[in-house]
């Protein structure tokens, strides 16, 4: 974020990206750059999807800054670089600025850094930022070790500072939508302070590299709907403090082919008028479960629409919201009543479910139509219990845990609700969902 801020301060238009499936980090990029950050994930989007998103987003920008995911070489498995920051860098031909953590290390830090540089010669590490420096003496030892061993220039030296620590929760950072204006201003102030310890001119020099362009961008057509009818379809999307896990690309893909209107399961009384479909994304319904419980009107409205076969697509937090209840961690006796479309309960646990998923659709007769496989990811601390055994499951997982025993996606009427998060750029999920909404509209 400091690099994004520093480039912006020099007058450059910065397009931020987050490598990997994370929903929260991009909201911090937005606060710094005032531009919508986009995710780049090879597993979710495919190579073509990466180029499509990247090239489209950077058309009017001077610089693209990509925040990595986990360690440089961490991806789908330990066998290769697939889906890692290094892999993404190789696809787009982007240089890497390596940030190394100096806590409890000095000369050893040089050995670790040298290992990163030599681990994969195809990866272009062009600059190093040393983070979490304890003191001037600590820095002196580090520089002495780097001097004879590391040829890549050090372009940033950042000292430890408790004031720079960001607020966290069980799934990581707290989404900026939940933060007060003061907290967001502090994030920007911290980025400003840290940027002063980075050689932004050197960043500019490193960043002036040519990006590969292997793409002829073409929108996927919806063959079964006349273009004149597309703007008649309205899809309502849940968006508030409880539900805000959406990829920017997904929203834009829907917007190209249908009208969208946002609503709040916390504050809205009904789904927007003339809606033909509903999307309820992920988020933190457990945090504000009491407010969701108290909005009886919207819950009743959603349940009635679902029972009348309105297409509804829900992921993770949306799945939890559509069950009978949500119980918080260490207080499972208190059940907050939710929509109750699916006869099951959600409880929060202390155990993290995290990883990429691969799913096969069990039927072509759902709102997602005839899709062979779906790539996604799951990231949650909740668990579905006491589910009615008669509930149909939309997906069988080749990879991942899902709701129960390698199956995911509760399916009822025209609704699918899964733990799996998906990206629309590399699949026909959005087109098939819009077609389902069109059929509903015509009834």
Residue ranges and their predicted role:
Residues 285-367:
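Cysteine-nucleophile active-site neighborhood
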Residues 65-67, 97-99, 129, 279-281, ...:
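Structural motif
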Residues 18-19, 154-162, 261-267:
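Beta-strand->loop->alpha-helix junctions that form or flank phosphate-binding loops
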Residues 5-92, 100-127, 136-140:
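ATP-dependent carboxylate-amine ligase catalytic core
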Residues 223-307:
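Phosphate-binding active sites in nucleotide-utilizing proteins
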Residues 15-17, 97, 234-236:
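Conserved beta-strand elements of the Class I
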Residues 106-226:
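Internal gly/pro-rich beta-alpha loop/helix module
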Residues 30, 227-231, 243-253, 261, ...:
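C-terminal and late-domain segments of enzyme folds
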């Amino acid at each position: 974020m400091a690099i994004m801020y520093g480039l912006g301060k020099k007058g450059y238009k910065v397009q931020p990206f987050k490598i990997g499936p994370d929903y929260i980090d991009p909201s911090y990029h937005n606060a710094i750059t005032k531009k919508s950050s986009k995710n780049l994930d090879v597993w979710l989007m495919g190579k073509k999807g990466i180029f499509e998103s990247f090239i489209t987003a950077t058309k009017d920008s001077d610089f693209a800054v990509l925040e990595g995911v986990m360690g440089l070489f961490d991806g789908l498995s330990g066998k290769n670089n697939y889906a890692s920051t290094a892999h993404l860098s190789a696809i787009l031909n982007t240089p890497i600025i390596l940030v190394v953590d100096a806590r409890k290390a000095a000369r050893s830090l040089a050995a670790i850094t040298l290992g990163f540089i030599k681990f994969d010669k195809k990866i272009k590490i062009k600059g190093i930022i040393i983070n979490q420096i304890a003191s001037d003496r600590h820095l002196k030892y580090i520089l002495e070790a780097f001097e004879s061993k590391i040829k890549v220039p050090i372009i940033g030296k950042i000292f430890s500072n408790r004031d720079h620590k960001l607020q966290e929760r069980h799934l990581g950072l707290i989404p900026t939508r939940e933060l007060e204006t003061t907290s967001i201003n502090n994030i920007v102030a911290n980025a400003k302070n840290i940027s002063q310890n980075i050689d932004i001119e050197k960043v500019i020099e490193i960043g002036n590299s040519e990006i590969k362009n292997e793409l002829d961008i073409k929108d996927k057509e919806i063959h079964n709907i006349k273009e004149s009818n597309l703007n008649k379809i309205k899809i309502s999307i849940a968006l508030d403090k409880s539900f805000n896990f959406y990829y920017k690309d997904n929203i834009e893909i829907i917007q190209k082919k249908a009208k969208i209107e946002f609503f709040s399961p916390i504050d809205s009384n009904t789904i927007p008028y003339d809606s033909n479909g509903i999307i309820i994304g992920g988020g933190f319904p457990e945090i504000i479960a009491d407010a969701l419980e108290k909005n009886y009107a919207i819950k009743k409205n959603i349940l009635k629409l679902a029972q009348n076969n309105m297409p509804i697509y829900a992921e993770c937090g949306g799945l939890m919201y559509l069950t009978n209840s949500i119980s918080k961690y260490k207080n499972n006796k208190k059940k907050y009543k939710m929509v109750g479309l699916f006869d099951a309960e959600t409880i929060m646990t202390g155990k993290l479910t995290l990883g990429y998923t691969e799913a096969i659709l069990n039927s072509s007769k759902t709102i997602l139509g005839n899709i062979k496989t779906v790539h996604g990811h799951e990231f949650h601390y909740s668990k579905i219990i006491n589910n009615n055994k008669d509930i149909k499951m939309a997906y069988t997982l080749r990879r991942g845990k899902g709701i129960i025993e390698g199956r995911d996606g509760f399916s009822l009427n025209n609704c699918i609700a899964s733990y799996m998060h998906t990206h629309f750029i590399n699949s026909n999920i959005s087109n098939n969902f819009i077609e389902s909404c069109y059929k509903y509209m015509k009834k």
